[in-house]
Amino acid sequence: MRLSQYFLPILKENPKEAEIISHCLMLRAGIIRQQTSGIYSWLPLGKKVLDKVCTIIREEQERAGALEISMPTIQSADLWRESGRYDDYGLEMLRIKDRQERDLLYGPTNEEMVTDIFRSYVRSYKDLPLNLYQIQWKFRDEIRPRFGVMRSREFLMKDGYSFDLDYESAKTSYNRMFIAYLRTFSRIGLKVIPMRADTGPIGGELSHEFIILAKTGESAVFCDKRFLEMTAPPVSVDFTDNVVLTDIVKQWTALYATTEEMHNAEEWAQICKSNQLSARGIEVGHIFYFGTKYSEPMGAKVMGRDGKEYPVFMGSYGIGPSRLVAAAIEASHDENGIIWPKPITPFDFGIINTKSDNAKCYGMCETLYQGLVNAGFDPLLDDRNERPGAKFATMDLIGLPTQIIVGPKSAAQDEVEIKDRKTGTKEVLTVEAALNRLSAM
């Protein structure tokens, strides 16, 4: 993509309404635009990042055996009355009526609807286990939306739901998603710590939040420092082997880690002080096991091996892709702008032509650009007729991991400069050597 043909509305000044760095940088870098309180449009640069996050989520869900569906954003209130949550959920749920005066709602979550889908088709234990998920926009009427897309009213959510015959099988499904989430966040470039958490309005017996540590986090968290040394399960993990899954989850839950709501001062005191870490954290995922909380009142039952009917055991699993984008920025930025993790960078490389009217610079930039495109990469070429300082500032702000700088002096020597956005290290290479180096990244 050539920047002269791209829609990238950069803001030079920090927006007054931005309270945290991710909100500020997402507005300044032309990633989002606020339409009204807590509701945002995603602009081209942001949409590319969001799509990459969703692609990784889908790949890991598929690897773990989950099946993607798509449910409507508007739901019937009758389903929520069946589960007993219609009156309990509170003012966060946007209640509406259609022209026939039927009670509807803009879905804040989908336990009831997916349970209705399940009970309409599944009758036998032979069709279990089953895990269905979607990536869909949701709405919760937050009393005080703030921090940009970190706490917005409309947000993108991957919500998944598992159905099993008994507790043992349901726990395996829970473990499967636990591990899939560890892999998902690791691939996105985030270090997460799974923490025991309150089940909240979803309900249930078991719940883990996946937290990244950040100074601007809205949650107080307490964990063992040794979590920071742990690495996510490999791609080779066998999601069909219950013993393997159980062992991995045990490793990741053996150390103390909890949110403020579940914090136990006595257990905390037993941890060596050198391993104690109290910090702020951002929730990027949440998983729940809630047994028959929804299947029982809604009649989601299957015929067991003994010919008797049993309500299915369920779990739900959420990741907020839109929130994840902001969390990635909170975790990786500097005074000049964003530093994207490579897996979710909007463009693979940024090419800066510091002298657009110089024929030599133009030719070398074109060679680099076409060479990278032909090699399967997605580069961004800043070919605008702007001063070099403005081009450097733009490229630093939008955070592409690798910059390729072409100027008259280096071009005269048939050389270009490669700069690592995170470390600031630079390397001077010929165009051919640069293409070889970049293609190997």
Swiss-Prot record:
Top-level EC class as recorded in UniProt:
ligase
Checking InterPro entries in the record gives: aa-tRNA-synt_IIb, aa-tRNA-synth_II, aa-tRNA-synth_II/BPL/LPL, Anticodon-bd, Anticodon-bd_dom_sf, Pro-tRNA-ligase_IIa, Pro-tRNA-synth_IIa_bac-type, Pro-tRNA_synthetase
Q: Name one Pfam family in it.
A: tRNA-synt_2b
Query: What is the superkingdom listed in this entry's lineage?
Result: Bacteria
Example GO CC term: the record gives: cytosol
What chemistry does it catalyse, as a reaction equation?
tRNA(Pro) + L-proline + ATP = L-prolyl-tRNA(Pro) + AMP + diphosphate
Q: Which UniProt keywords apply?
A: Aminoacyl-tRNA synthetase, ATP-binding, Cytoplasm, Ligase, Nucleotide-binding, Protein biosynthesis
**Where's it found, cell-wise?**
Cytoplasm
Q: Which GO terms describe its molecular function?
A: ATP binding; proline-tRNA ligase activity
Q: Which Gene3D superfamilies match?
A: Anticodon-binding domain, Bira Bifunctional Protein, Domain 2
EC numbers listed for it are 6.1.1.15
Q: Name one GO biological process term.
A: prolyl-tRNA aminoacylation
Q: Which residues form a coiled coil?
A: none
Q: What cystine linkages occur within this chain?
A: none
Query: Subunit comment for this entry?
Result: Homodimer.
PANTHER family attached to this UniProt entry: MITOCHONDRIAL RIBOSOME PROTEIN L39/PROLYL-TRNA LIGASE FAMILY MEMBER (PTHR42753), PROLINE--TRNA LIGASE (PTHR42753:SF2)
Please explain the role this protein plays, according to its UniProt record. Answer: Catalyzes the attachment of proline to tRNA(Pro) in a two-step reaction: proline is first activated by ATP to form Pro-AMP and then transferred to the acceptor end of tRNA(Pro).
Q: Which family does it belong to?
A: Belongs to the class-II aminoacyl-tRNA synthetase family. ProS type 2 subfamily.
Protein name per Swiss-Prot or TrEMBL: Proline--tRNA ligase
Q: Which organism is it from?
A: Bartonella bacilliformis (strain ATCC 35685 / KC583 / Herrer 020/F12,63)
